[in-house]
């Protein structure tokens, strides 16, 4: 992270003996080439790495996904207000997941993020399955849809 102030997270692994893979993450849509260069220059210095190691710096892979939930609200709840609140909660969820490399998108966590006091039930429509994100990937939410499908007395 000290190589460039834009770096928010980093993954370091050794995919093969004698090789070090460094994957820096920034808040930018694409990791700028200057960040890759800065990390390479800092980590490839002979006083930093063993002489036999090869340093590879790579941009992270973006794993796009969309969030869609169907919610049933308790009677008396205002659909527009609650839709906005749930959308905001899902935006926070997506932002938190985007901030680190390798954070999985788990359907039960999506449902939990929607559990406001006015929500009776949540069905996660998308993603259709849990998304397992590798340490060299970051999850990137491309859209959020909240459908109010009904009301219940509880």
Model-predicted regions and their roles:
Residues 84-154:
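An aromatic-glycine-centered, glycine-rich loop/turn in mixed alpha/beta architecture
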Residues 1-103:
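Carbohydrate-recognition loop of C-type lectin domains
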């Amino acid at each position: 992270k000290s190589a460039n102030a834009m770096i928010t997270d980093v993954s370091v692994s050794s995919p093969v003996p004698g090789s070090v893979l460094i994957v820096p993450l920034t808040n930018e849509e694409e990791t700028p080439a200057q960040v890759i260069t800065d990390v390479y220059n800092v980590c490839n210095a002979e006083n930093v790495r063993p002489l036999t190691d090869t340093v590879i710096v790579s941009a992270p892979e973006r794993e796009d996904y969309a969030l869609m939930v169907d919610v049933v609200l308790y009677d008396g709840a205002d659909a527009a207000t609650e839709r906005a609140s749930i959308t905001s909660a899902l935006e926070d969820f997506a932002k938190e997941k985007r901030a680190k490399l390798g954070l999985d998108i788990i359907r039960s966590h999506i449902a939990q993020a929607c559990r406001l006091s006015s929500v009776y039930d949540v069905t996660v429509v998308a993603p259709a399955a849990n998304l397992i994100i590798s340490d060299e990937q970051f999850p990137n939410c491309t859209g959020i849809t909240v459908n109010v499908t009904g009301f219940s007395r509880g």
